[in-house]
């Protein structure tokens, strides 16, 4: 199963780097759209999320939110499920 992960970011955002670090740790591939590099990305993000802050993270087309929401999903063990993975055994 391929999971579609989309991040709207800027290159200076520490929360964006934090979210990407977690995804990298989990060996997740993502598509990244810099909202400052292309104004169309900013518009698309605002329309899809209703928000103007970054990062905005989508998994399989569903808005997750920002880095805090991404980490909260991970702490609850729900991120692995969204990514189509079996959570680690406890």
Regions found by a protein language model. Name each.
Residues 1-29:
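Local sequence-structure signature of Cys/Sec-based thiol-disulfide redox active-site neighborhoods
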Residues 4, 89-90:
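Terminal leader/tail segments of proteins
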Residues 31-33, 62:
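Structural signal for short hydrophobic segments within the conserved structured cores
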Residues 34-52, 78, 82-85:
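Thioredoxin-like thiol-disulfide oxidoreductase module
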Residues 49-58, 68:
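Structural micro-motif
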Residues 59-89:
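Non-catalytic, surface beta->alpha helical segment in thiol-disulfide oxidoreductase systems
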